[in-house]
Amino acid sequence: MTATAQQLEFLKNSIKSIQDYPKPGILFRDVTSLLEDPKAYALSIELLVERYKNAGITKVVGTEARGFLFGAPVALGLGVGFVPVRKPRKLPRETIAETYALEYGTDQLEIHVDAIKPGDNVLVVDDLLATGGTIEATVKLIRRLGGKVTDAAFIINLFDLGGEQRLEKQGITCYSLVPFPGH
């Protein structure tokens, strides 16, 4: 099933836009409103599973926290394992970490060292692509463990914030269901 224009418009309309959140001048795209609609949520998962069902994916990685909400059901639909990437000190087993830049400062992500095996074909899933910094750090973690990442999937792409171009420079093909301007 290829996504139809009607299906994509339905998904787009299920995402609420909140002006001046979290600070003045920001138009926040609230994917939690999509989660509140079981038809929209199910459709978003079905479309991602359909796109990647024959891609040879062996693991799906989701980034904290909303990436878990989409990545885990996509992994189930593909019949593969799900691997969470989390903020520091949230995973109980041995981890490796990757630091990445924020607008003001840095942050860090971690993954279990035994979660990805050399040669795993990994799909990264998150709710939203903006500047691409979080996903770039996630991809670095996966590659450090020997995993192969060629694709990342998103519900929303804030297309004018440069994330897709940033990830393409890392050899990542980005796919999103709903494009929005970031400003």
Swiss-Prot record:
It is an enzyme of class 2 (transferase). SUPFAM superfamilies: PRTase-like. It catalyses: AMP + diphosphate = 5-phospho-alpha-D-ribose 1-diphosphate + adenine. InterPro entries: Ade_phspho_trans, Adenine_PRTase, PRibTrfase_dom, PRTase-like. GO terms for molecular function: adenine phosphoribosyltransferase activity. Its main location: cytoplasm. It is found in: Cytoplasm. Keywords: Cytoplasm, Glycosyltransferase, Purine salvage, Transferase. PROSITE patterns: PUR_PYR_PR_TRANSFER (PS00103). GO terms for biological process: adenine salvage; AMP salvage; purine ribonucleoside salvage. Pfam families: Pribosyltran. GO terms for cellular component: cytosol. Its EC number is 2.4.2.7. Pathway: Purine metabolism; AMP biosynthesis via salvage pathway; AMP from adenine: step 1/1. Gene3D superfamilies: 3.40.50.2020. Belongs to the purine/pyrimidine phosphoribosyltransferase family. Catalyzes a salvage reaction resulting in the formation of AMP, that is energically less costly than de novo synthesis. Homodimer. This is Adenine phosphoribosyltransferase. It comes from Salmonella heidelberg (strain SL476).
